[in-house]
C-alpha cells in the first residue's frame, strides 16, 4: 500500500476525492503522479484539468498528468498556456511540461518563454526554473542564466541565481557579486548560490527507487493528516 502502485489503490484515491475540500483533493492529485501509464488515472486527471473551477487544483492535476501520461498532457498544454489564473499558477504548470518532457523542441520553447516578453510576468520565472533541467546536457543554458541576472524581473533574476547555484562555477561569482551590488534584496539568495558553488553538495546516496518510494509515502502521510 505504501508505494501506491496497485490499481486498487488508485481507484481508492480517485473515489476519496469526492466531496473533499481543495487541500485534500490537491494532495490526492499529487499522490496520483505515481500511477504512470495508468489509463484510468490519466482520464480522471484530464477531466479535472478540463472541468475543475479551482485554479490550484487544475495546476496540480496537470502536473500530475504530465507524470502519468505525457501524451495526454501535451494535448492540453497550449490551451493552459493562455489560461489566466491567480498568480498564473495554471500557466506555470503548463510551462513545467517543457522541462519535464525533454526535447530540443521543448528546450527552444522554454528559451522563448524565459525571454523578456516571452510570456506573462508571473509565469516567466517558471520557464527559467524549467530551463535549468537542461543545463547538464546543454551547457549553453548557463549563459542564458548569466544574461538573466540583468533581467527587469526580480523573480526571474532570483531563479537565475538558483540555477547558477546548481550549474554554475567559480567563473560566475563575479556576476553574482555584481547583482548583489545592484540589488541587495537578493543578498540571501546570492550568498546561498556562492556557498553552493564553492562547496558543492555531495551526491545523494539514495537510489531513484528509494527516493520515489519515500516521496510516495510522504504524499500518503500528507493525505492522512488532511483527513484527520
State each model region's role:
Residues 1-6, 14-18, 23-37, 47, ...:
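Structural detector for internal amphipathic alpha-helices that build alpha-solenoid repeat scaffolds
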Residues 42-43, 54, 87, 120:
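Generic structural signal for alpha-helix starts
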Residues 44-47, 76-80, 208-211:
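Alpha-helical repeat scaffolds
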Residues 137, 152, 162, 183, ...:
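Intrinsically disordered, low-complexity polar segments enriched in Ser/Thr/Pro and acidic
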Residues 144, 175-181, 208-216:
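Alpha-helical scaffold repeats of the Armadillo/HEAT/TPR superfamily
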Residues 10, 38-42, 74, 107, ...:
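Core helices of alpha-solenoid repeat scaffolds
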Residues 187, 191-228:
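Pro/Ala/Gly-rich low-complexity, hydrophilic intrinsically disordered segments
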Amino acid at each position: 500500500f505504501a508505494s501506491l502502485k496497485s490499481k486498487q489503490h488508485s481507484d481508492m484515491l480517485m473515489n476519496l476525492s469526492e466531496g473533499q475540500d481543495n487541500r485534500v483533493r490537491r494532495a490526492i492529485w499529487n499522490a496520483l503522479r505515481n500511477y504512470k501509464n495508468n489509463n484510468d488515472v490519466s482520464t480522471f486527471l484530464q477531466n479535472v484539468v478540463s472541468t475543475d473551477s479551482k485554479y490550484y487544483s487544475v495546476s496540480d492535476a496537470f502536473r500530475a498528468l504530465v507524470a502519468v501520461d505525457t501524451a495526454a498532457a501535451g494535448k492540453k498544454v497550449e490551451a493552459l498556456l493562455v489560461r489566466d489564473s491567480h498568480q498564473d499558477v495554471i500557466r506555470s504548470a503548463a510551462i513545467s511540461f517543457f522541462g519535464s518532457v525533454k526535447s530540443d523542441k521543448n528546450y527552444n520553447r522554454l528559451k522563448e518563454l524565459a525571454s523578456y516578453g516571452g510570456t506573462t510576468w508571473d509565469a516567466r520565472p517558471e520557464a527559467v526554473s524549467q530551463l535549468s533541467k537542461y543545463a547538464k546536457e546543454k551547457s549553453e543554458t548557463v549563459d542564458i542564466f548569466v544574461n538573466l541576472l540583468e533581467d527587469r524581473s526580480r523573480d526571474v533574476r532570483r531563479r537565475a541565481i538558483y540555477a547558477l547555484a546548481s550549474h554554475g562555477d567559480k567563473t560566475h561569482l563575479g556576476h553574482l557579486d555584481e547583482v548583489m551590488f545592484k540589488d541587495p534584496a537578493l543578498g540571501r539568495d546570492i550568498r546561498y548560490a556562492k556557498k553552493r558553488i564553492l562547496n558543492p553538495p555531495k551526491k545523494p546516496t539514495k537510489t531513484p527507487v528509494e527516493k520515489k518510494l519515500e516521496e510516495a509515502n510522504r504524499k500518503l502521510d500528507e493525505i492522512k493528516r488532511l483527513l484527520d
